[in-house]
């Protein structure tokens, strides 16, 4: 895995086109993404060390979740690799209720970077300046859930 500065530069390059192609981003960061068809609904995703690739990581995401949810989960797992590779060990499993066994701070950091990846401030601000401020319209363009966009805009209820 590359250092955090290089990883953030790769992320920034992928943010030039909205919606961010999150699987392409993961691949460029050296991560493989697998969709798992038979996970329980409360299990969103996980990241673990790739036992075949020294220093590599694999991301697994629940195939039955909506595309917007899968995209956020992939971005969240990318964030763990970028921010917390030393904590991953044999894997971080994120479920709908517990998120993972990690601290709330670590999970909050991963959620913030995931939001930054999928809804970059610069792109969002340019649309807001053009008068595009509908949560639904922005969520559709950025391919995120209405809830994720509302949180990003600070208008979540």
Go through the PLM ranges and name each one.
Residues 1-157:
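Active-site hotspot residues in diverse enzymes, especially metal/ion-binding acidic/histidine motifs
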């Amino acid at each position: 895995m590359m250092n955090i500065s290089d990883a953030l530069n790769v992320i920034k390059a992928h943010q030039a086109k909205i919606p961010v192609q999150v699987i392409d981003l993961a691949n460029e960061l050296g991560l493989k993404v697998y969709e798992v068809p038979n996970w329980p609904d409360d299990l969103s995703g996980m990241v673990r060390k790739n036992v075949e690739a020294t220093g590599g990581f694999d991301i697994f995401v629940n195939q039955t979740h909506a595309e917007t949810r899968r995209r956020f989960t992939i971005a969240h797992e990318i964030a763990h690799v970028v921010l917390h590779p030393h904590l991953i060990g044999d894997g971080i499993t994120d479920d709908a209720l517990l998120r993972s066994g990690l601290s709330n701070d670590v999970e909050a950091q991963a959620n913030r970077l995931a939001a930054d990846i999928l809804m970059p401030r610069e792109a969002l601000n340019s649309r807001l300046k053009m008068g595009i401020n509908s949560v639904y319209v922005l969520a559709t363009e950025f391919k995120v859930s209405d809830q994720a966009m509302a949180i990003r805009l600070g208008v979540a209820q």
